[in-house]
Amino acid sequence: MKQGRYPYQSWRQQWTEKDEEIVLSALKATGTEHLQDRPVDELSGGQRQRAWIAMTLAQDTDIILLDEPTTYLDLTHQIDVLDLLFELNQQQKRTIIMVLHDINLACRYADHIITVRDRGVYRQGKPEEIMTTDLVSHVFDLDCQMTADPIFGTPLCIPYGKGRKI
């Protein structure tokens, strides 16, 4: 996790007490204190994602960019990672920009969604304002029913699947 502080090191200034404090704070925020001495390749998928997020937090930036942070994770770990990112956004006021291909998780966790088609922005805005059956059909080439999530009230995509139209 200490590698997240690498951009702040130079030949004149090596590891400082401030670096140590920032790394410990990142470990605590991600619940990975007990993993700090283990090689990343020995961690489970969920632990590995948390370790990468801790490393990102250790960079101490206002904006965090993530590309598919839930890839290869089972549903429980996907929710754990997204809950963690949500908490970081709420508690530390960090801007988090991420790529997610799961429409339902994007709608549940995002304040703002940007949909992309043909290498350009197709539509953007609050999930409740832009996520429609027409958008999903055009952007993802998927027939679906959009409804409100019964628990969170966010848009929920129920795909029909190819050849299974109602």
Residue ranges with predicted function:
Residues 78-93:
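Helical segment within the ABC ATPase nucleotide-binding domain
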Residues 113-126:
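H-loop (His-switch) and adjacent beta-strand-loop-beta switch element
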Residues 133, 139-166:
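ABC ATPase nucleotide-binding domains
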